[in-house]
Regions:
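C-terminal catalytic "cap/lid" subdomain
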Residues: 1-203
Length: 203
């Protein structure tokens, strides 16, 4: 069925995305929205403008079962295309610039960072909460906050005011391709269902 607006692993039926720009697809692949593609499979296509087609080989080849990936196209009519979700994240807050010892330590113990952001005098490293037990013996003088999930919005970022009662949101970054938010919520599946329905991504 191509790439869905929400990863099918959540069991929430959503629409097939007809078109994704290269950078939108990379964002979705990196942050839990599309397990059928990998960022490294898209990056070589960008310089030459080669398109990619994602479709189910067991279904008829129709617009409803196919996602095309190509050059980024941003228009006034651009809208939210997809939601990515990585459950169970931790955010390490440290003084900027980031201490090289921290980055070296993460590399040595083979931990993947999902995002690094700098705001003012501080830097924020986002990674899986499952790695924290390995990290704590190697770091000190840092603040660590835990969140239910990292949510990525691909396309136009929606207003989250109507979802304030369902979760405590923390913005990490935003760009023309979307944004990254950490959220604490008592019911992640319910929040994803509500986001999908209210933002018109559900089937």
């Amino acid at each position: 069925k191509g790439i869905q607006s929400l990863n099918p692993r959540w069991g929430i039926p959503t629409n097939t995305i007809p078109y994704l720009g290269y950078n939108e697809a990379i964002t979705l692949a990196m942050y839990g929205g599309a397990s059928v593609i990998h960022p490294f499979s898209i990056e070589p296509l960008i310089s030459s403008g080669i398109p990619m087609e994602i479709r189910c080989i067991f279904a008829p080849h129709t617009p409803e079962t196919t996602t095309y990936i190509g050059p980024d196209i941003i228009t006034q009519d651009s809208n939210l295309k997809a939601i990515g979700c990585k459950p169970g994240i931790s955010v390490i807050k440290c003084h900027a610039p980031i201490n090289s010892k921290i980055l070296s330590m993460l590399e040595q113990i083979d931990i993947t960072m999902w995002s690094i952001q700098t705001k003012g005098n501080f830097a924020y490293i986002v990674l899986s909460s499952s790695h924290m037990e390995s990290i704590f013996p190697h770091v000190d003088s840092v603040d660590v906050n835990h969140f239910t999930a990292l949510i990525s919005f691909v396309g136009t970022i929606p207003s989250l005011s109507e979802f304030d009662e369902d979760g405590n949101w923390h913005e990490f970054s935003r760009s023309k391709n979307g944004g990254l938010f950490a959220v604490n919520t008592d019911n992640l599946e319910y929040l994803l269902r509500k986001l999908s329905a209210n933002l018109e991504l559900s089937c």
